[in-house]
């Protein structure tokens, strides 16, 4: 999978980011190493019933950490980063599947297109099922229904891989299954129910990540206007590792999470012009506007009734 290309606002920004990257903090990757210690250390220690809410947080945080590992942090060695993200605390998918689909998602000109962008919430006209998608497109539906749809789609792709004998994908799922079995055996040994973990912790943690992805992208003609800037509060920024500044991340996928906010604040007005004002003042704004009212993310406007991409959206 080709590495995503960085897109700078201007040469001055390129030079400024280069200066940032030479700082001790960026070179050491200390914030990401501390995050790894927190997720692995505290997750292991909090395996008791009253700690459910904290376990949901740390499991969702682990999913954010996996994203950071995919983009080359804290080391430049993909195989080592994969070791740090392979433990199936997220349960529902292998790290390799997330890595490959997410890197495909970073093709700017294909962003939001349902056939080509694996993370698109849009559909072709043929696959759009009105009532179910409208429920998923409400804020509450995104929390309750979207994780279930994602899990069903992921398991469906796994079954297809076995049916078509895709050896590499089958091996990836077998490794994931073995690690998951070992994790559940360890939980059971500690007297912590794996079923409780799946239903009361892992599913809610996956739902929590759907807060970030709610209207994270829109189907605009200009690829630069397709990713949101969400000026979220501190708690959400920490949980999502600053991916609320999503437009900045898509321009500069190699920038570590602790640099995204600094870069955005240095160029706030320029980024807001660049993404055509696709800016929201925190996740509470989505909650107020779309708690029970569906957002218009359904059949992709760039696809005609035959399911083919119109030229102006390619």
PLM region spans:
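Histidine-centered catalytic micro-motifs
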Residues: 63-72, 98-111, 212-221, 239-255
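Extended hydrophobic/aromatic segments used for targeting, binding, or gating
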Residues: 201-233, 237-240
């Amino acid at each position: 999978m080709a590495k995503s290309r960085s897109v700078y606002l201007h040469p001055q920004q390129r030079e400024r980011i280069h200066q940032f990257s030479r700082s001790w903090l960026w070179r050491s990757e200390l914030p990401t190493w501390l995050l790894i210690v927190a997720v692995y250390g505290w997750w292991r220690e909090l395996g008791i019933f009253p700690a459910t809410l904290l376990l949901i947080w740390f499991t969702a945080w682990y999913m954010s950490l996996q994203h950071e590992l995919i983009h080359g942090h804290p080391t430049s060695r993909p195989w080592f980063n994969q070791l740090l993200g392979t433990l199936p605390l997220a349960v529902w998918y292998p790290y390799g599947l997330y890595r490959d689909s997410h890197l495909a998602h970073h093709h700017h000109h294909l962003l939001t297109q349902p056939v080509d962008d694996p993370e698109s919430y849009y559909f072709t006209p043929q696959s759009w099922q009105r009532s179910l998608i409208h429920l998923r497109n409400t804020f509450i539906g995104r929390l309750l229904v979207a994780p279930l749809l994602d899990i069903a789609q992921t398991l469906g792709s796994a079954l297809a891989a076995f049916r078509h004998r895709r050896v590499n994908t089958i091996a990836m799922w077998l490794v994931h299954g073995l690690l998951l079995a070992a994790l559940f055996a360890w939980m059971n040994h500690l007297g912590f129910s794996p079923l409780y973990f799946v239903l009361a912790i892992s599913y809610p943690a996956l739902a929590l990540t759907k807060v970030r992805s709610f209207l994270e992208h829109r189907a605009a003609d200009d690829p630069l206007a397709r990713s949101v800037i969400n000026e979220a509060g501190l708690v959400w920024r920490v949980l999502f590792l600053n991916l609320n500044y999503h437009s900045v991340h898509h321009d500069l996928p190699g920038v570590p999470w602790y640099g995204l906010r600094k870069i955005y604040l240095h160029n706030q007005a320029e980024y807001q012009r660049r993404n055509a004002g696709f800016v929201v003042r925190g996740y509470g704004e989505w909650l107020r506007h779309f708690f029970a009212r569906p957002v218009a993310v359904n059949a992709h406007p760039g696809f005609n009734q035959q399911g083919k991409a119109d030229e102006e959206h390619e």
